Amino acid sequence: MEEEILRVDGLCKSFVVEKSLTGKISQLLKNEKPEVVNALNNVSFSVKKGEILGILGESGSGKSTLARVLMGIHNADSGSAELLGRKLPGDSRDERMQNLRDMQMVFQDPFGSLDPRMTVRNILLEPIKIHGLKIDGDLEDFLANALEEVGLPKDCLDKYPSQFSGGQRQRIGICRALILNPKLIIADEAVSALDVSVQAQILELLINLKENRGLSMIFISHDVAVVRQIADRIIILYHGNIVEEVDADSLLSGVKHEYSQKLLNAALSLREGK
């Protein structure tokens, strides 16, 4: 039986829609209830060891909210999530730190997610220091090997984020996520800000990391072609609801929900230039 890395059961999250001052006054005068958006509605799924689960949906579908809830940035209204059998985000500080070590995130903006005042060396050392990670052997060799794994040379260590291309910065972000040897990576629109040719290189890197490390991944995107290329299994989100779950090979022929079909048809029309 395949090892289960992550289990999510009945996750729900809602937000009150923020209004302008005028809107708030009007709401009070009319005695109206605040408008609530259900960002996640009874979301359940699991991720196996060495599996890439694609989360596909348009803007506003709840994809990024899901990532933020799993990472502990937002608290769920109800439902539960477990990482390697431990409750997320964790019942104690030690458990929360262990969960953060075992589950890392790669962000959409490779420049905005890196501190421009820090060298690559310090960017990589920061999580090591925060988590008190003990390095066996020479630290310099450890950092050089970490960069090599994501396709970057050792001489990057003393450079700043502004000295790199978008693709190189995303490799640095991936390297930082890997430095703690996590069991699960959440990649939130991790290639959407990159050129198509660079996207392909980063996708290939992520697939290689999965195969070489046995790494599990949640890959979040609005791009049908990208998700189909990288994922083993795909969940389609619509207004916070899972409307479809299919193997990646069955995406083009196996979807049944009306929204899923519209999403695929729109992607095919764009590809054909219609």
Stretches with model-predicted labels:
Residues I179-K183:
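A short, proline-enriched helix->beta-strand linker immediately N-terminal to the Walker B motif
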